[in-house]
Amino acid sequence: MARYIGPKAKLSRREGTDLFLKSARRSLADKCKLDSKPGQHGRTSGARTSDYGNQLREKQKVKRIYGVLERQFRRYFAEADRRKGNTGENLLQLLESRLDNVVYRMGFGSTRAEARQLVSHKAILVNGETLNVPSAQIKSGDIVSVREQSKKQVRIAEALSLAEQSGFPTWVAVDAKKFEGTYKQAPDRADISGDINESLIVELYSR
């Protein structure tokens, strides 16, 4: 399946919640009506959604949040299932540990899509070395920074300033003056923001 390149707000409206696909400079609630589905008058249905439908919708929502395609997502779930502990939490930790997501969480990109672009364009270093693979898994102690030539980009400075005002996640330590951050550890479930019910995804793949 190809990556979706259409209006991002439409995806959030479809799920009825902010998927954080747009910059936080303006509240998404100011940009569109999250309580109505896409379409001229908002699509409605009197039919109750089945358990399978809810599970499938939750998977689609998480894929859209992290910008992951179906084949990648299946691999992440298989790896999460192999690991010890809660499969759903393992899945979210794997997604949160992606390089593009860590760049976003550290505030170098205003959205995950922008962070992914920075990584692909070789604007990001990991432990001092260029790494242009958005899906690369970041480990505890890894240092993620902005390449010297890219520090002049206005969009990075603006995104970082906004992130400083909002506050960084507890599992990363960011030095905004150096355009650098340390990935301290994989986040606990309570540290992962977003309206996600990962148990529905586990149920879907357990069918």
From Swiss-Prot:
The keyword Ribosomal protein applies. Residues 31-54 are annotated as: Disordered. Keywords: Ribonucleoprotein, Ribosomal protein, RNA-binding, rRNA-binding. Coiled coil: none annotated. Residues 97-160 form the S4 RNA-binding domain. GO terms for cellular component: small ribosomal subunit. HAMAP family: Ribosomal_uS4_B. NCBIfam families: PRK05327.1, rpsD_bact. This is Small ribosomal subunit protein uS4. It comes from Cupriavidus metallidurans (strain ATCC 43123 / DSM 2839 / NBRC 102507 / CH34) (Ralstonia metallidurans).
